[in-house]
């Protein structure tokens, strides 16, 4: 049994295709959209209402409150566990979403460093005090490739990159 992946931008018909395919082959659907993990984040995410899911089981929808932070590392663990359980039951699996990193986390052998909330808070505080330009310059000095991939305006990702550098050396 294999895993089928349907990915693409929001509101491009992924869900309709997944539902039709799931009905045809008896599959269950695993969400791979980072915003659809959140309860109440329905507008703007094109999340299907329960009544639109045609009785097909959907996994990893509405699993976080809006005040909780999504973690791709935790998503990877949860999604792989669900997929493994379904495959053990000989259930076809359809992964549907538009968050490329989440899909890669399922399919590829990505390793995610641990987090250190105290360290992240310290670096985030520095970011608030020093500003995004200084923090991005610090990242560029320590990891030019990461700095090239992360816009300076995305302070949350800059802070996470600096945290990973400090944790992993």
Language-model segments: which ranges?
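Phosphate/pyrophosphate-binding catalytic cores of soluble transferases and nucleic-acid-acting enzymes
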Residues: 1-169
């Amino acid at each position: 049994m294999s895993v089928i992946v349907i990915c693409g931008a929001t509101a491009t018909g992924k869900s309709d295709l997944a539902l039709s395919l799931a009905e045809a082959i008896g599959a269950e659907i695993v969400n791979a959209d980072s915003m659809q993990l959140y309860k109440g984040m329905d507008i703007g995410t094109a999340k299907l209402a329960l009544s639109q899911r045609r009785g097909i089981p959907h996994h990893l929808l509405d699993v976080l409150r809006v005040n909780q932070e999504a973690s791709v590392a935790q998503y990877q663990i949860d999604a792989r566990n669900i997929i493994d359980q379904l495959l053990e039951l000989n259930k076809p699996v359809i992964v549907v979403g538009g968050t490329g990193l989440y899909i890669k986390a399922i399919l590829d052998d990505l390793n995610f460093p641990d987090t250190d909330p105290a360290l992240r808070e310290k670096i985030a505080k520095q970011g608030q005090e020093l500003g995004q330009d200084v923090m991005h310059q610090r990242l560029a000095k320590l990891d030019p490739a990461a700095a090239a991939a992360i816009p300076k305006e995305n302070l949350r990702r800059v802070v996470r990159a600096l945290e990973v550098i400090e944790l992993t050396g």
